[in-house]
Amino acid sequence: MRGWLEEAIEPVLTGALLAALRAKDPSGAELAAMAAVLRQACPLPGPRPELQLVDTCGTGGDGANTFNISTAVAFVAAACGAHVAKHGNRSASGSVGSADVLEAAGLNLQAPAPQVVGALPTAGVTFLFAPGWHPALVGLAPLRRGLGVRTVFNLLGPLVNPLQPDCQVLGVGAEGLLDPMAQALALLGVERAVVVHGHGGLDEASLGGPSQLRLVEAGSVRADRLEPDRLGLQMAPLEALVGGDVATNRAILEAVLQGRSTAPQRDVVALNAALVLWAAGRAASVADGVPLALAAMASGAAWRRFEALRDALL
């Protein structure tokens, strides 16, 4: 990893190494070691806020073309009292990434780092646009695009938030990534986290059936499952959560945060936000978090968090 960051490895060899890493599932220890090096390469421009921070960044790549669920979740959780440091990027595929939809909604992705961090105490949420915080990786971007496949760096994205959040909800699109990602979070010292793989292959908790969870607390990992109908939420097919182009996804994001979305869009955000509220200690259980999240959307409080962040980054 240090060789890549220092550009000491030839591009041809880099491509071969990335392809080799893709051929095996990395262990939690390997992911944690690589993430630790990347974290050291992106020092903060100033002191870290003395707040308990939570991130909602997942691996993406589930191919389901849902709307930007975890992005909406960030603002809903903030409206419920969590301090959310959302780490994200543009989409590397044909789908719409968190940065794409937030930029379309008016968020300034190029705000200076002190301004981005400084938004947290007032807005309760901020967005760290990954390319601006990881300049050492810029040189690898053309090679990664040229390979045309997902690489280990897609897994590292959720592990290298520069603010090193205390808590996290991390969605994975493959069930085999549940344990490695949970182990990596534990090794990196995250206080409490949820790694989730949704029914139907989603990298979010799903309304279509049970979601598989790994709960990380104080360095230990345990398995659990989440069933939406037991939390008072209506089951819904994947088709009810599908997004579209950036304009469509922006419209859905705004509708969700303003309390005027469809019931499945609202409920899947509430389900995932409840996981965040539990991880951040803002709800005693996931079940307790669901009504808090629903109220934040219905009242427009989640939209006001978005407006506060948009104004803070002008």
Task: Give the predicted meaning of each segment.
Residues 91-107:
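Active-site-proximal loop->helix
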Residues 62-74, 87, 93-96, 137, ...:
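Short glycine/serine/threonine-rich phosphate/pyrophosphate-binding segments
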Residues 25-88:
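Active-site cofactor/substrate anionic-group-binding motifs, chiefly glycine-
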Residues 40-43, 47, 66, 81, ...:
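Glycine-rich anion-binding loops and their surrounding alpha/beta cores
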Residues 13-16, 85-87, 195:
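Short beta-strand segments at enzyme active-site cores
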